[in-house]
């Protein structure tokens, strides 16, 4: 595990968890930032000593449980994870661990002759198997045998709440939990080779012990389908994707699992339509692109031609890694570029299509364009694009596993994530920043149509969109749409469609709903950004985040690039299938 992040020590985490926010703010005002950083690094060094101690305990674990350290597999005791032993694998993903834990428990139960059925639990990121209380002893023995194949952890739960520390299956504490737990959280711990990405019981297979009551088997906690079943209810076999929104429904076949008919039916909240992703990307370091850009006059505002807007820091590589890790249900990725391809891109991957600007602009006179508003106005013209899709810039990242329901309702409505930031109130002026000018133009059009004055901007998080609504907007506002699509650089007459106008228009016409997302916005030019990146890496608690650079004057590019590369490679160490294998490691 990396030891360079001062925000990642257990002591700093405990301080933030236990000390009220108001008191922490008072401390921050009184203690200089430099001194706080020194103290955090000191705590981190103490954490390294703790890591050495835990590695020594890992050596003792090797002697105590030699069967856990098989030839050809690397295992390590990892700090910050309760001294758990993690299986180190070249490829680690939340869905992969979820499936592996389900396979592990299903195999153990079937080999022991224990009847079970899968249940639709309240979390899409874990699997759940129900067994009869009368089979508890057999289940315990099966899990002990299961531990012979690798480090398997158990954790007793009441409802969704853990009631004990994780314990190795087969250990004294593990046996105790298996004898008494109403719900037994079961699974392995996986780590990538760098130790930066560690996944554990958040992707477990939970074993529920259902008790007999009035001739029925009764669940020990709520689930999404039923409180009880008949012991004789017929079993059916369904794909795992039927039981969770996190599975890759439209991209690959998932294993099947045994369940009861009540759990096999589609539920009203299930999103069953395909969802694509669209990226727009430019390599501002490309000499040919720079020559094309310099042949035309710049934008009206310094920010519209700010070089920082076009700097490529390899964000796309890591945004795709984030997508593959945290949204395996995405059907297809469309990468919109100006005839460019990253050298590392595996553009022959069947789930990736590179789309040139010329394929979506009907009027050749509009090209070349260096205006993101113009490019975004043509996204719905991508051939083969699904009706429902997410639009991302390469500075947007999924920070933890998400489901389709985080962005869409099952009836097709899109979720809108409003920002606390506001569209400035004065009328448009040449001094407006491009984003503010477009927001004001959006406001004027929406006021004319719907009689409401929009105030809030949108979070710079993945935008949930519908192709048909974008087509409707082009028909509804033909002049503004045409003018935006033909503005070679950002212009004071632009409208911003997928990042703002769409969401209000869809809301006013009953096709979008305001929603929340755990989100963080970071600007590389801000002095506190290194600390915030460290906190984000230590916690990994945001569903999405954006790392932007709108304020940089270009003098600090090298330092920012190094800082961002260190952060992204630690947050997303596992290459995606969209990278060429021979150049995937970085």
Swiss-Prot record:
Belongs to the stealth family. It holds the Pfam family Stealth_CR4. The lineage of its organism: Bacteria, Bacillati, Actinomycetota, Actinomycetes, Kitasatosporales. Signal peptide: none annotated. Its EC number is 2.7.-.-. Coiled coil: none annotated. Stealth proteins are part of a protein family that is conserved from bacteria to higher eukaryotes. Family members were first identified in microbes as proteins that help pathogens to elude the host innate immune system. Microbial stealth proteins are involved in the biosynthesis of exopolysaccharides. Stealth proteins are predicted to function as hexose-1-phosphoryltransferases. GO terms for biological process: polysaccharide biosynthetic process. It is an enzyme of class 2 (transferase). InterPro entries: Stealth, Stealth_CR1, Stealth_CR2, Stealth_CR3, Stealth_CR4. Keywords: Exopolysaccharide synthesis, Transferase. GO terms for molecular function: transferase activity, transferring phosphorus-containing groups. PANTHER family: N-ACETYLGLUCOSAMINE-1-PHOSPHOTRANSFERASE SUBUNITS ALPHA_BETA, PTHR24045. It comes from the Bacteria. This is Exopolysaccharide phosphotransferase SCO6023.
